[in-house]
């Protein structure tokens, strides 16, 4: 390279630049320096004046520092004049500029790569660290994929960690086909455990940007408790019911059988206890924000729960939820009989209901999202376009394609590709 210095600015000119042809040249320019209004306009006006064709362009601003790349074609055999003008304008703007000629063969090869598979990798954590970025980047490279773009989804991070509940999310856009997807998933899971983060790997398709229906489990997902355990404590059978619940969540007991066993233990409990529990449900971190934004952007929302309709309807009123399907407890003379009414909403039924609601709402199954924490949520998680295990048991987390374990339920927004910069300002 020939290096030309102008006070604080410089330009790198490849040696072959002096031997370039003067017709239909393809040139890549990279500009970096302090960002301020008018830099991009001033440089692109030079290209416009010379009737250049823009073949690719990208710009990023990190901490008020500009990084701009433009790939253009000179069609009038005057690339020397264009580069000269750009050079002096960059000096005037106090930015650094670098030129690289691109051969037709190099350009054609680049164009041919556009058919490669594209994926989105999303990182969630309480704090973003260099180890996290390095770890994800290493795994991507080992799978022979290339990172095209990296952007921060969460807002600017304050130095005062006590200012708010911290969360950080970064999105990678990558291109290529993984050599071994199962191995990659295992590596991501291992890394997420070691570095306290969540890693989502999704195909970058139009459906990812057009989700329209989201279905939630209720207990230990929308709320930070298992309602049946709360009822059992009031009935004096807390330990017995909790043991059955935990075994069912781990997939060790058939859900329907565990449900019948637990309901039977609640026989004789006064229904007034249900209202008391409903009014004091511990809402999961991030639910208020998530529900507000989902309704704002037009999502249909459903609760598909192995819990009870009484509590699902309470949340339905609180958050304007569209559908609630759960289990109905039988009541006689103001007390629970220990039986239930109707079919049990188990894992199979949840998947059926997701399909049914999608059909009613005219939503493609690939436009759906399912979120849950237990083994009986896996059927709906597995068929949804985006299935998420939330603070789930190890077996569920290992089976689900995506999981969230480090931050609140509003982490789903980042898996959907939303950015804080335009969410919170408009909500």
Where are these regions (language model features)?
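Short, Lys/Arg-enriched N-terminal segments with co-localized hydrophobic residues
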Residues: 1-19
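A conserved regulatory-domain signal marking ACT and ACT-like small-molecule sensing domains
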Residues: 18-211
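Conserved active-site and cofactor/substrate-binding residues in soluble primary-metabolism enzymes
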Residues: 34, 38, 77, 81, ...
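Short glycine/serine/threonine-rich phosphate/pyrophosphate-binding segments
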Residues: 39, 132, 222-225, 377-380
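Active-site neighborhood of HAD-like aspartate-dependent phosphohydrolases
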Residues: 47, 206-256
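Long, charged amphipathic helices and adjacent flexible linkers at domain junctions
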Residues: 106-115, 201-212, 245-269, 426
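C-terminal cap/substrate-recognition subdomain and adjoining C-terminal extension
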Residues: 268-427
